Structure formats: structure tokens, C-alpha cells
């Protein structure tokens, strides 16, 4: 298995499928892993639980929903940004929440970008493709 470049953390299967489809059409989803909640995301990132023993390479970007079961996106973001080994991983919140407290909290915790999911399919598709191009091909993270 290749190193995961995009970790998609999304509990809504329709949104996950649209995101994967948009990235696949532009050949940006070759190394994408979809997890369904925040607990699974943290297990993957920290190589614990069902991911224990996996090669612990870090994704190039995490696309993170906020409103999820078990562990919500804000809790995931807080754990990632407060941990020395993961604080530099770019995290893009991709959510339906336009709530100012959510936006403020995410930026206070160190989110790299906060994107409200467009309602229309074509707008959603375009936004996801642009995110993929930027975070995988244009952005230069620290090594």
C-alpha cells in the first residue's frame, strides 16, 4: 500500500462519495483513505487500535468534517494540533457548519483552512478539486 496522501474523515457517505469522485476524476485520489469518524481518524494517525503496527507516515492533508459520532472534528483537530508529531499536518475542515463559534474555535486550534461544503453538486465538486490541487500539488509543507 502506498502512503496515504489524503485522509478523508467524513461520516456522511454521500458527502464522502462525492469528495472521492471529485478527486478521482482529477487523479488526486490514488492515495486516499476514508475513515468514518473521529475515533478512527485518530487511530489511523497515531497507529493504534485496528491500525496498530501500520507504517506511520503522515498524510499530506486531512479533510475533516466537524459533526461526527464518537469523536467530533474539533476534538480531532485539538488532538492533532497539540501533538508535537502531528501539529504540522495540514488540516482542512470541510463541513456544512457556518456557525461562527465553530469557525473561531477551529482557527484558534490551528486549522489550516475552513471550507463550508457547497450545496450544489458542481460547486461542491469544484471546491474539492481545488482543495486537492492546492494541498497536494501547490502547497509546500515542512519536511
Where are the model-predicted features located?
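Conserved acidic carboxylate
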Residues: 10
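Acidic, metal-coordinating helix/loop segments flanking the phosphotransfer/catalytic sites
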Residues: 18-20, 33-61
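C-terminal output helix
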Residues: 40, 119-132, 136, 140-143
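Receiver (REC) domain active-site loop signature in two-component systems and cognate sites
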Residues: 66-68
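Hydrophobic residue at a beta-alpha junction
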Residues: 70-71, 80
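Hydrophobic/aromatic residues positioned on beta-strands within the core alpha/beta folds
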Residues: 92-94
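Short, glycine/charged-rich "phosphate-handling" switch motifs in NTP-dependent
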Residues: 112
Amino acid at each position: 500500500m502506498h502512503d496515504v496522501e489524503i485522509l478523508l474523515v467524513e461520516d456522511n457517505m454521500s458527502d464522502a462519495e462525492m469528495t472521492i469522485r471529485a478527486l478521482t476524476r482529477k487523479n488526486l485520489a490514488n492515495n486516499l483513505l476514508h475513515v468514518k469518524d473521529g475515533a478512527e481518524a485518530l487511530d489511523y494517525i497515531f497507529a493504534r487500535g485496528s491500525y496498530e503496527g501500520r507504517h506511520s507516515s503522515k498524510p499530506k492533508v486531512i479533510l475533516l468534517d466537524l459533526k461526527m459520532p464518537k469523536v467530533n472534528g474539533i476534538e480531532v483537530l485539538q488532538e492533532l494540533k497539540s501533538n508535537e508529531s502531528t501539529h504540522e499536518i495540514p488540516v482542512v475542515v470541510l463541513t456544512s457548519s457556518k456557525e461562527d463559534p465553530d469557525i473561531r474555535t477551529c482557527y484558534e486550534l490551528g486549522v489550516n483552512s475552513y471550507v463550508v461544503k457547497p450545496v450544489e453538486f458542481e460547486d461542491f465538486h469544484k471546491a474539492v478539486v481545488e482543495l486537492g490541487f492546492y494541498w497536494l500539488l501547490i502547497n509546500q509543507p515542512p519536511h
